[in-house]
Swiss-Prot record:
Belongs to the bacterial ribosomal protein bL34 family. This is Large ribosomal subunit protein bL34. Gene3D superfamilies: 1.10.287.3980. Keywords: Ribonucleoprotein, Ribosomal protein. Pfam families: Ribosomal_L34. It comes from Mycolicibacterium smegmatis (strain ATCC 700084 / mc(2)155). One of its GO terms (molecular function) is structural constituent of ribosome. GO terms for cellular component: ribonucleoprotein complex; ribosome.
Amino acid sequence: MAKGKRTFQPNNRRRARVHGFRLRMRTRAGRAIVANRRSKGRRALTA
């Protein structure tokens, strides 16, 4: 029985484009996410 391939293939550019700060600031909901993380005192706001 062969297992499937590993699903996490790290790629920094994709990580930034999908979860990055610029993307979060683009939408109202994204800005809310950053604001919540700021108020919570998260060390890293975005990827």
